[in-house]
Amino acid sequence: MKKALLTTILALGIALPSDAALAHHGWSWTTGENLELTGVIKKVRLGNPHGILQVEVAGEMWTIEVGQPWRNAHAGLKDGYLAEGVEIRVIGEPAADRSDRRLKVERLFLGDREYVLYPDRD
């Protein structure tokens, strides 16, 4: 009985996300206000839980979080559109800690085309 209880407790501990992971996901880490940035994509990592772009903006590197694969696809955004060397304009919520230089995208623009990832946010 004790072994089963210990196994259950350990399994739950492994399955539960860390405080850092919980704090990072969602919008609680952002300012709640929008910021617009334009820059050049330097690095791309797409996939779950969400895509990450490294974008050079006015000589500074920003971490830009795009949506989950299903959200990007729903907005009409194809993975191949987000590539190194592509100029991108993003509107979204920056990290409350501005020194983090991280932004969660609500809308992004590639050329003249707009992709709305979070239509219920402004």
Regions found by a protein language model. Give the residues of each.
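Bacterial N-terminal signal peptides that target proteins for export
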Residues: M1-T8
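Short boundary/loop segments of OB/S1/cold-shock single-stranded nucleic-acid-binding domains
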Residues: A21-L35
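Conserved hydrophobic positions within beta-strands
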Residues: G39-I41
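Short aromatic-glycine-enriched beta-strand elements
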Residues: G47-E56
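A short macromolecule-binding patch
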Residues: E60-P69
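Short nucleic-acid-contacting surface segments enriched for D/E, G, S/T with interspersed K/R
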Residues: H74-V90
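OB-fold/S1-family single-stranded nucleic acid-binding modules
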Residues: A95-P119
